[in-house]
Structures are given as C-alpha cells and as structure tokens.
Amino acid sequence: MARHDRQCSGHKSPDDLTYNFRHRTDVKQAAANSIETPTGKDSGDENFPVGSFLLPKALRPHVATYYVLARATDDIADNGALSSEDKLARLDRFEKALTGEIPDDPALEKSYAVRRSAQATGVPLQHAIDLIHAFKQDAVKQRYDNWDDLMGYCALSASPVGRFLLDLHGEDNAKFAGSDALCNVLQVLNHLQDLAEDYQTLNRIYLPGDWMAAAGAVVDDLERDSTTTGLRRVIDQCLDGCEELMKQARPLSRQLTNRRLAMETAVIVRLADRLLVLLRKGDPIAARVALGKLDFLSCGLRGIAAGLFRK
C-alpha cells in the first residue's frame, strides 16, 4: 500500500504479466510524448504488491489505472534533466486533466483513465490528486526539518495509496489510521533503502534534519562507502518511528471486511516487518538493503494464511 511495491510470492500472475508487457510497450510510445518522461519502471520494479492476484480480479484494472498515473507523474518528478519549473508545469497539466480543467488532450490520457475509473467506482479523485501534490513537492523541496515534516510528505505520497485501496474495496474510513501508518512506514523504509541514490542523483534527503544535526550526521555522509556512526543513529531513529507506526498497522488486516484485501494487507505487514529487521542489521550506504526471494515467499505464505484464518 505505498508509492513503492513487488509481488510477495516472487511470481507474477498472468494478469500482471499482461499488464507489465503492455506498460513496457507504452514506454516507447510515451518517449515521444512531450509531457511524460518514462523510466521504463512498472509494478514489477516495486518493493511491495501492486494489484497482485490476491485482490479481486474485477478491481485489479482500477488499481493498474491508478498505478500507471502514479508511475508517470513520479517519473516526471524524478527526472533530473528537468527544471523544477518544468516539472511543476507538467504535473499541473496532469492534475488539471484529473479535475476536468483540461478536457481533451491525448497526452493526458492516464489522468482521464483515472477519472473514468473514479466515475465507475465512486472512489474519490483526491487520492490521485494528493499523489500529484507529493510529486510537486518533490520538485521543489529537498530537505525535511523534522519527523513531523517527513510525515507530512508521506501523507501525500503514501497514505493516499492505502486510502484508494480501502475505498475501492468498500471499507469504511475508520480503517484509514491503520492504513496511513502502514503506507507511511513503507515510504520511509523505501527512503532508507535509497538514501545514497536519492541524494546523489536528485539532491534529496528524506531524513529529519534536526535528528541529523543532533547526531552529528552531515550531508557528506551520504557519499561515503559505509554508514557513519551519526548517520546510523539517524537511520535507527527513523526505524524506531516506523516501529511505532507498525503498532497501528499490524491489526489492520484483521479489521478489514474484504478477505482478499485482508490477505494482501497481511502480506505487506509481514514484508514491512522483515525489511525493518534487514535495515536494522544492514548498511544501506554500503549496499542497497532489499528483500530476497525467500522473504517474499515466507511473508506471502504467512500473510495469506493470516488473512484467510482471521479471528
């Protein structure tokens, strides 16, 4: 349930294989598009499940439609060759297409597809608009003052994904708190995985600035071969914050009405817990800390069982 996900079993379903093939084909077509700047990434490149086989088959196309727009707009924000002004202008066009202010532009079809999906399902467009606002923030904001500042970013970049899925499956708003907590954890964990890359390629640091100052961590630490003592302290503080959020997130799968969504959520919770352990032990500056095939298999099987046999 966050901006960034991969299938738990390590295998793609036929639906996912078809979608990924179509998406990679679309990359070539979009390359000539003056608005999009595709990287070629798709749902198979993410850390956590994106519309996996666990979700109801009838709803997976709506998840794919939402993801495709998120991917396209995220790629714009992450394009180092574009100026901040250019990024904002492109993202603004996608947002205006979502809200109906730009009614007929073939280059904005991904926004129109989300509008059609929203009309068909009743899911609020705000969940897509919030993501675009997060990417606009990425275009102009490269540092975060404190944990609350970082959580404010996650409220736009991560929480809307979980809320979209809850609304799509007919869950009530009372589940938002647990979903927000889980999605925000996934976002922070992804930031910790990509600390060096985000700084070196985009000059972004998704760490609380006050924690860095207190620990004696400096920007240059992100260009070293391994994690410094000060930076390790900040990483561990972020993991402590994630652990607190997971206390809210872990009960979520047992609270959901839709059993298939509960299974997917239970899998994601276990993947998040596993990545928390790996990031405690590993050095994300020396090498990217990532989940392995056995992690996906183990978390997938345990999560599915937990979702099936809920109390």
Question: For each predicted feature, which ranges?
Answer:
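A cross-taxon signal for low-complexity, glycine/charged-rich
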Residues: 2-5, 17
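Catalytic cores of Mg2+-dependent Asp-rich isoprenoid enzymes
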Residues: 19-187, 192, 196-311
